UniProtKB/Swiss-Prot annotation:
Gene3D superfamilies: 3.30.420.100. It holds the Pfam family Ribosomal_L18p. GO terms for cellular component: cytosolic large ribosomal subunit. The gene is rplR. This is Large ribosomal subunit protein uL18.
Length: 117
């Protein structure tokens, strides 16, 4: 089985479990160059908050968007935006990625920023 297909299969199982929790999910996507995070309310089908290394003001200040430091910055930013909207508790959707490196840095920074999961 293809590595990406296996990741997507794991992600599908995780999302099915998260859907029963009835709280917004913090969804992470990482590419070779960037990292993206969204707080999604699946009951309404809306994105409540988002942050990524592609954003203009962050892109200028960050040299590289694909490292652990950038992931930590994105975690803090998405937590601040979620708190501004009134979301304090989320379910963490790591999208089938291992909880290691950039994914872990983003999660730890989001927790430090005030989100609980």
């Amino acid at each position: 089985m293809n590595k990406n297909l296996a990741r997507l299969r794991r992600a599908r199982k995780t999302r099915a479990r998260i859907a029963s929790q009835a709280k917004p999910r913090l969804c992470v996507f990482r590419s070779g160059r960037h990292i993206y995070a969204q707080v999604i309310d699946d009951s309404q089908g809306k994105v409540l908050a988002q942050a990524s290394t592609v954003e203009g003001e962050l892109r200028a200040s960050m040299g590289r968007g694909a490292d652990v430091a950038a992931a930590a910055t994105i975690g803090q930013r998405v937590a601040a935006k979620a708190l501004a909207v009134g979301v304090k508790e989320v379910a963490f959707d790591r999208s089938g990625y291992r909880y290691h490196g950039r994914v872990r840095a983003l999660a730890d920074a989001a927790r430090e920023g005030g989100l609980s999961f």
